[in-house]
Structure formats: C-alpha cells, structure tokens
Curated annotation (Swiss-Prot):
This is Ubiquitin carboxyl-terminal hydrolase BAP1. Belongs to the peptidase C12 family. BAP1 subfamily. Component of the PR-DUB complex. Its EC number is 3.4.19.12. The lineage of its organism: Eukaryota, Metazoa, Chordata, Craniata, Vertebrata. The record marks Q85 as: Transition state stabilizer. The gene is BAP1. It comes from the Eukaryota. One of its GO terms (cellular component) is nucleus. SUPFAM superfamilies: Cysteine proteinases. It comes from Gallus gallus.
Amino acid sequence: MNKGWLELESDPGLFTLLVEDFGVKGVQVEEIYDLQSKCQGPVYGFIFLFKWIEESRSRRKVSTLVDETSVIDDDIVNNMFFAHQLIPNSCATHALLSVLLNCNNVDLGPTLSRMKDFTKGFSPESKGYAIGNAPELAKARNSHARPEPRHLPEKQNGISAVRTMEAFHFVSYVPIKGRLFELDGLKVYPIDHGPWADDEEWTDKARRVIMERIGLATAGEPYHDIRFNLMAVVPDRRMKYESKLHILKMNRQTVLEALQQLIRVTQPELIQSQKSQESQSPEEAKPANSKTVAPESTHPDGADEPASQGHTTATQSPPTKSKPVAKASASSINGVPPANPNPIVQRLPAFLDNHNYAKSPMQEEEDLAAGVGRSRVPVRQHQQYSDDEDDYDDDEEEEVRNTNSAIRYKRKGQVKQEHAAGAADGQLSVLQPNTINVLAEKLKESQKDLSIPLSIKTTGGGAAVAIVTHSQPSPTPSNESTDTASEIGSAFNSPLRSPIRSANPTRPSSPVTSHISKVLFGEEDGLLRIDCLRYNRAVRDLGPIISSGLLHLTEDGVFCPLAAADGGKSSPPSIKPGEEAQVTIKLDEKEGSEASGSKEKELLALLKCVEAEIANYEACLKEEVEKRKKFKIDDQRRTHNYDEFICTFISMLAQEGMLASLVEQNISVRRRQGVSIGRLHKQRKPDRRKRSRPYKAKRQ
C-alpha cells in the first residue's frame, strides 16, 4: 500500500467530502482568503499548504532537526495525536487527521474513533504505521484524487533536478491544552508556538505565526511567492442553520400564542365574533363574498389601486366571511382539494388574521403598489429547495403553503374605527410595511438599555406576560452565525429589499396607506417616509436576541427560556448573569386602550423580526446546500477517467486518415518554435561535448 496513495488537491470541497467519507459528522472545511481578518466562529484547526524545498524530502525520511520550539517530552507527544509521515503523498491525510483526532467535541464516526482509541499512547512512528495500514483511509482519499497520468519512460529522465525538488506539503495548526502546536509529519517532534493571550483567540496567534512564516508580516522582498493555501476545519454550517431555524420557529409560535392570548384578554368581543364567523357554513360565505367585491373596488380611499383589490378577493373580504374564502384560495392555489371542509386549525383572532407572515414585508409593499394579488404562487417559491441527502425541504414547503393563507390578521386601526363609529361592516386592510418599520424602530429604541425592564400596561385581566431575552449571542459554537445570517443574508439572500432599493423612502402615493398610518399611530405623513434601512438595522440588532435562546409560553402567560430544547437539535445557550433583559408586559385594568395598542405593536414588531431572521437563515441554509452539491459535481469532474474518451477520439482520427497529418503538423510547429520533444533534447549535450574536444586539439 506504500505506493498506492495518490496526491490530493488543496480544495475545500475535496476535504469536506473526504471528511464525510471518513465518517465524521458535523464538520466541513473552508478556505481562508484573508489572514489579517479575524476568524468568525469556532475553528477546530488550520491546514496550511506551502512549498517544500528541503533536499531531504526526496529521501522520504523524517527530519531530525530539533530546535528550542520542538517538544521532546514523550509523555506530551504520545498523549496527543502526532504521527510521522511514512508514506509518500499522505501529508494531506496526516494534516486532516491531526486536526480531527485532537478535538474532543467532534463526532469522529466508527473508523476514526477506533483508530484514536487503538493508537492512544503510541509513539509518532507507530501512529504513522497505523495510518499507512488503514485501508479505509486509503480507499476514501484515493476516491477523491485525480487519476495519475501514464508517463512515458523516456520522459522520466528528462525532468530537471530543480523541478524534482519542487513539491508542496500540508501541515496543521491545532490548539491543544491552551497552547498552539504545529504538527508536521515530516518532522520528528511537534512544534510548540506557546500559549495565546487572554484577550485573544487561538486563531489570532495562529494567523500571526503563518504570516511570519510566509513573510506577510515583514513585507520583505524574498517573500513574494504566493503559492500557499490555508484552510480551516469548522463546524458544519448546515447543522448550525437548522438549529437556529428550529429555535426561531419555536419562538415564532410562542409569539403568536402570546398575541392570541393578548387579544383574548384585551378584546374578548373579537374572539366571540370570530367564533360566530366559524360557525357559519361555507355556502353562506360565497354569496356574501360576491356582494362585497364591488363596494370595495369603488371605495374612495382605494381609488389608486383597483387592480390590487380586484385580484385579492380572499384577503379583502368582509370580517364575517374571511376564513372560508381564505381556505378556498389556499386549496385552489396549491391544487390539492381539502381533506376536511372544516379543518381544525390553530388561528389568530380577526385582529391578527389578515396578514401573510410567510411573505416578505417589503414584497407586500411592492405588490400593493404594483397592483398584484397577494396570493401569487411565485412569491412562496423562494423557500422551496431540495437535496438528495437532506430531508428538511418537505417540512418547509408544507409550512409555507399552510401559512400563506391561514395566518392573516386584521389591522388594529380598523378595530378602533369600528369600535368608535359602531359600524358593523368595517373595511379590512393589510398592515402596511411602513408601519412595520415604525414598529421595529420603536422596539429597537426601547431596547437600547436592556438593563431597564420595559413595562407596558394595558386593559384586560390581571395576567402578566414576561419576555425574557438575551442581550447578545452566547460565546458558544454558534457565536458568529447570527452576524452571518443577519448582515450577509439580509444583503444578498433575504427576501427583503436590497440596501440600494431600500434607501428610497416608502411610497406614500396611496391614500389608504396614509389613512392606515394615521389610524394606527395618530401621526402625520412624516412617518410615511421612514427609511427601510432603519428597519434592516433593527432586524440585525434584534437578530442575536431572538435567535440565541428558545422561549416558552407557560400556561399562566409567561415567556421563559427552556433549559433544554425538547426534541430539538441543540439546547439554547446558557444564561450568564448580566446578559439577559426582561421585557415585562403587564395587563392592568386601570389603564386605557392606548397602552394596549402599544403592546400589540411591540409584539408585532418582534414577530416581524423573527420572520425576517427565519427568511435570512433559510436563504443561508439553501446556499450551503447548493454549495455542497457543487462540491460533488467538481469531485466527479476531477476523478473522472477521460482516457477512454481520448482513445476513442484518436482511433476515430486514425480511421479517417487525419491522425498522421496532425501529428506531423504538430511536430513541425514545435521544431520551428524551438520546443524540444522526446529524446531530441537529451541527445544534444553528449554530441556537443564530443565535437568540442577535437576542435580544441586542432587549435593547440
């Protein structure tokens, strides 16, 4: 097996697939492009590729050079996984194993776990023999290597000595017991670079060591060689995003339950009217729906957008018939007949039952201004993706379909207007995105000082609702995921508008928009030109809070963080003293209805932020799945054997009588350009020496 190990390319996709073939779970490999930028998130180790120029490399022996940084203590060396490279072309496997087998919080799988247990306490040489005699490792790594070309015998002797010494070598940098070690299989001992500072991560020290090695720190003239590569072994981002999505979806359900509980306490008449609506049969809903379409289309406030109201019959229906029409639209869009005409679905009251939470708020604004119906199918397709080995796409698709028409809410301003005027046939309208911007901005301002609890007193019963959140993400393995999803995802992958388009103020062209804002907030048109970038900043700031812990709504109406996620993929991070803030929402009978509206606005803004974070993480998860598919495609192209195709093509040229002419033409072109072919270049030097000796003798 000593001559059966093929060379591996320094490609993060190749190493990621190789880790999977080894049986390791929850690990991937990424390439580092900037050594001067701080590494985000946990890193298990670095794999560094550099040009190997030592003369002793050709003898394939372990170097015996020892300096002051070498660790010669056998107890320390044998207790870590450090193996001598005894097989050529195995440095990539040695570097990868040196990172994985020195980590305690990685699921190694059966193969590597058995090797780690078997070689515990072995010397580096014995561990090197263990790697060389593991057929599972050789088979896995050779399956991702490019097939070696078949060299002609005469070409082997023509390689110069300078080219023979040019080779590349993999080493690893791993943190072990508070110190940074460089593990090189061609050196007899590991190299200890010492501990890192208290105010920095181990990756910061590793980056400095690598920069000094390649000469970037001194910017010297001899260090202009850029033929090096650095890769990081990190946790699998797919699992991290799935865990975050699980927490966010649980929190979304919790906030929805809190909103429903609030409506039951503050406005019980809406719950009673909803029950009366559900008791009516679908047959009575159809004629009532047809009667109300014409008055809505001729409403004076909605004159600027008749097309939008004409296409959205289901969402613009009267309060008494909104539920059956929503069901009918959902079944017609999905193309699947409903199994039960009256299914038992957990719904929000009419106050919150007219908004589509599965749709982007910015897309709603654009659709409303453009006159496009809200039940468009392409809007929901941005979350549907599939992968052969991943099974989470089906759940996402079902959830998007269910929430598209079932979860809607009735705007609060219309409820106030109906209560004041006593009208029985009020108008329904969707809450505009510019009002959502104001809600998020107010919530952001209220949480600037997280040490001060926020108390909002409203009318209703005596129950108390306390929202316990975190002020910053916990320094656990998902420390950087929120920044990635909120900042990068919102700019590139989020269904929200891009910052360039969001820089324009929201459109106050419709009088309906102005009327809704005045009813909700009692303010003038100045709020209509809120910059959407402020909403994006609010979402980014609230992202670490709503996605770092799993909230639970108890029976007595209190939000509390769970100690462990029940049935979830991961438990929420631990709560440290001083790192949590309580937003207490009390229901008091002495206060008026204005405080109730402010509390509902806060919960709606929080719900919007949760939805935005879910959209961001779903986009990031989809990107990681697509990246993994591209890794497999590149691997198939790399490992495919093209010899059969080439031989078939050459034989076809020979049958057509074109091969001889092409070969002769190619040889003549190379001779004119001075390019040597075959043995012609090798025979010139001996001939030149034989002719020079008699020439010198004649002159003497």
